[in-house]
Amino acid sequence: MDIQRAKEEIKRAVQAYLATDDIGRPLIPAVRQRPILLMGPPGVGKTQIMEQIAQECDIALVAYTITHHTRQSAVGLPFIRERNYGGHTRSVTEYTMSEIIASVYAAMERTGKKNGILFIDEINCVSETLAPTMLQFLQCKTFGNQAVPGGWVIVAAGNPPEYNKSVREFDLVTLDRVRRIDIEPKLSVWQDYARAHRLHPAVTAYLELRPQHFYKIENDVDGVQFVTARGWEDLSAYLQAADCLLYTSPSPR
């Protein structure tokens, strides 16, 4: 589906997950609230729609690109603690709070909002050491031994294998515990976005004439050549800045 339809689907899911009955119980029990898994090419707008959904639902948002993190920052740092088991003192390994879980609590304190979205990007592109942690996160909604707080909806995003060589395929057990939404770029949807955000007319006019250039990734002798929706928006910002500088530059003497 296109990015606009995906946004609507996710927004409805978030609203359903956070809805409660007259005595405050979730209409959908937490165990039935499947994490949402977005799969789509880079630069299509996955992170942007999460920001929009959080704003429209008046909830908090914590977003992480997981490839920027290590196992220690995701799970926490280990430390040794003495425990008594069966009358014997034993040294056991425990962990500090996950940096990601700590960020959720910090967002709740900062915004005053108890509900939110925890968005993990590039979840299927993690290193080998972090991959089991991500599987546990999707299956159990935990990082290490710490659960994601109640009232927080988990949304993850990844890239299909054709766009990223480091992609790791999820097994059937994991896929059976998530709600997967596949996203494809669609020019007409992006054009609506471009008009609403007043992107540079040179960009929109060019894509009217060359729609086949909107989203393209190919390999040639020089390596991977690509253009994405994000790239067109960045170009628009550059052109608008150039226009502003041109109009405000002093005239030559």
Range-by-range predicted roles:
Residues Y247-R253:
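Conserved small/polar residues in nucleotide/adenosyl-binding loops
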Residues R198-L246:
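Conserved AAA+ ATPase small/helical "lid" subdomain
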Residues R12-A16, Y238, T248:
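A generic secondary-structure signal
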Residues D2-L207:
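AAA+ P-loop NTPase catalytic core and its hallmark functional loops
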Residues E56, C140, Y238-A241, S251:
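Active-site catalytic microenvironments for nucleophilic, acid-base chemistry
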